[in-house]
Amino acid sequence: MKAAAKRISDGVYWTGVLDWDLRNYHGYTLQGTTYNAYLVCGDEGVALIDNSYPGTFDELMARVEDALQQVGMERVDYIIQNHVEKDHSGVLVELHRRFPEAPIYCTEVAVKGLLKHYPSLREAEFMTVKTGDVLDLGGKTLTFLETPLLHWPDSMFTLLDEDGILFSNDAFGQHLCCPQRLDREIPEYILMDAARKFYANLITPLSKLVLKKFDEVKELGLLERIQMIAPSHGQIWTDPMKIIEAYTGWATGMVDERVTVIYDTMHGSTRKMAHAIAEGAMSEGVDVRVYCLHEDDRSEIVKDILESGAIALGAPTIYDEPYPSVGDLLMYLRGLKFNRTLTRKALVFGSMGGNGGATGTMKELLAEAGFDVACEEEVYYVPTGDELDACFEAGRKLAAEIRR
């Protein structure tokens, strides 16, 4: 097949893959994504940084060959593997077959992971690197920075010193698929919305590590050298401080005066309560978002929770437990550990027909997920006017607590 590489700097090319059709990736909904790979061409050698998802070798290789032709080079001399996960290593075996003399540069932890995924690479030459190690391509110098648990134990960044390009793998990424490659080539609100969703669903539990790594980058004197950030998904950041500042804000719990109301319902009673709570919150002048789990996707909901000062979570009781869709969200929130950014206020609510129990379980699980549950509203069957007034007041009080 034919596919064009995209020049992003002198001797540096995007050679990734466009996945137009992807709609769900380990529970995360999206409208396609990219698997970004980059070819760095020096006077004495060529390095390929990361690769792509299994089954996409032909597209990736077509772009690599196009870039090689543009610079008058014949082969890839070095393979850089910033991260083991298959959306960035999925064609590594084919690359090794095509360029058998090219050593694979990665962290020591990554070697173990790659061999577990791809046993046929046992005969490949691996070069393990640590923070500060360099690879000289002749006029192009790659410096490696270990970033364990950002977001896997094997992860690392690669910095192209001369151009100030940070190849950050998953960090600073977005799940977007479009012909444009640079941040400034698409509307900013689309870019930042995708970056926020990516952070909320993938980086939130790592927030303290994000801040720690930023401090390390500053101490090493690398921050002022970064002129561009090239992640492994989505757009390339030509204004790197925009996303660095956004990550700092998200990691430190900078939130809006917003209440996000999330619920599911069987016969409409919990919906009535949700709407009353939303009205109460709005009466305090804060922003309000309302999601029904029967209709809305959890990865979109989590994106709004990231910038919300409080949430209200509602479910009817079924078999003495919360409605299943709400239980699913609770387990997801417990894993995301939002309290590592900020302990957000919360209230729980719902209707029941027997002994109840859903609100108590939700309160307990939200506390485990790092939320401060300030209120609990439960009604028998259909809420009365007085009970809806109580929901309104609960929403108003919740909003008042987060007003600055």
Swiss-Prot record:
Catalytic activity, EC: 1.5.3.22
EC top class named in words: oxidoreductase
Keywords, alphabetical: Electron transport, Flavoprotein, FMN, Iron, Metal-binding, Oxidoreductase, Transport
Coiled-coil spans in chain: none
Gene Ontology molecular function: any one: electron transfer activity
Residues annotated as binding Fe cation 2: 87-88, 170, 233
Protein's UniProt name: Coenzyme F420H(2) oxidase
Organism: Methanothermobacter marburgensis (strain ATCC BAA-927 / DSM 2133 / JCM 14651 / NBRC 100331 / OCM 82 / Marburg)
